[in-house]
Amino acid sequence: MHIYKSTINNCRFLSLLIFAWALMPQILSAANPERIKIEKGPYLQAVGENEFTVCWRTNMNSVGWIEIAPADGTHFYKKVRPKHFDSTFGRKNIGRFHKVRITGLEPGTAYRYRVMQNSVLLDEDYTRIIYGEGFGSDILSHKPFQVTTLDPAKKSVKFAVGNDFHEKDSLLRKAFAKARDKKYDFVMFNGDMTTRMKNEDYIFDNYLQSASELFASDIPLYMNRGNHENRGSFATRYMDLFPTLTGAPYYTFRQGPVFFLVIDSGEDKPDNDIRNLDIMCHDEFRATQLEWLKGVLDSEEFKKAPVKIVFMHMPPDGTPGSWYGTQELNDKYMPLLNNAGIDLMLCGHYHAFKFVPADTKGYNNKFPIIIHDDAVLLEAEADENTIKIVTYDKNQNPEHRHEFAVSK
């Protein structure tokens, strides 16, 4: 009799355990009533002829994915859309920041996309993963996001540039308020968007979330490091937030007739300067980048492009008043670029507009250079014959205009 009662009690206890196990997701959900949502982003990165990358952050741990559909006029729910997961070599990533690269696309083609995530309530290593609710971008009350891949056959290109905003998010919102209406092919942030790389929130709060809301969910955003992106404890995480087509902070892309060359100018002071905290090694970095640059300039893709434009945050200034970093660029990069048929270089760094015509003493340049002012907008249009530049002041009034004939 005693054995019989003990068996019954054990069975009841086991039943309670099974019941509690089954209720665990509901218990965890009740303990964490916050719903999964897109907290920051999305924003586009590394848009190429056959690919694009979407980045965003959720408010809690989750797995994330992107669903895509051609911009063919059909409803997004017309059919099952392919899912592309934030994953690492076959395993979905669990976290808050998500990054999804989508490849195998057609050049010059518009694609709609939907951002999705499923909350993770419990991750017990090898034992089990308990999921909560899933949700994503609302395609019932809002149109899906849309991106167009790059197209080298396009006859012209229109783009915008901003640099040296240094936490002036309100000025960025003014400068790029009409970015969607102006239908830029892309936007380039050409360095020093913040004074330091403090943490993820600091970057989102000071410019990246505004960029997402104003244009970067649908218009490609390209980034170029300035000297200040090298500073701060989050600096080595730069590539996590801003992936590129090369996997390095220097890269190239082609839109329409223009071959764009993005060069990372590095730090402005010597590596051993006391203010660099004994943490910089940019001499080595610039040497590595220089070898990459030689290969780019020797490529048929570069040589055959009708127009060639360089983005570089620090100008290649070799005048007597220049600093170490700009002198290094002048000494080591300009000899290569001067023989490469460059049509225009766009820089920042000096927080003041300056036009540097070809053959300016101290710059040793065979092509024009525009040093763009801080925290204002530059717009450019180019075809195979002409490059047109307009810069604006902080009240959004046109300030400088330049037109350049493309070298043949």
Label every PLM stretch briefly.
Residues 115-146, 202-298, 332-338, 354-385, ...:
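Extended active-site neighborhood of metal-dependent phosphoesterases/phosphodiesterases
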Residues 155-157, 182-187, 217-221, 255-259, ...:
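Loop/turn elements at helix/coil->beta-strand transitions in domains of secreted/extracellular proteins
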Residues 276-278, 282, 300-344:
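Active-site-proximal segments of metal-dependent phosphoesterases and phosphodiesterases across multiple
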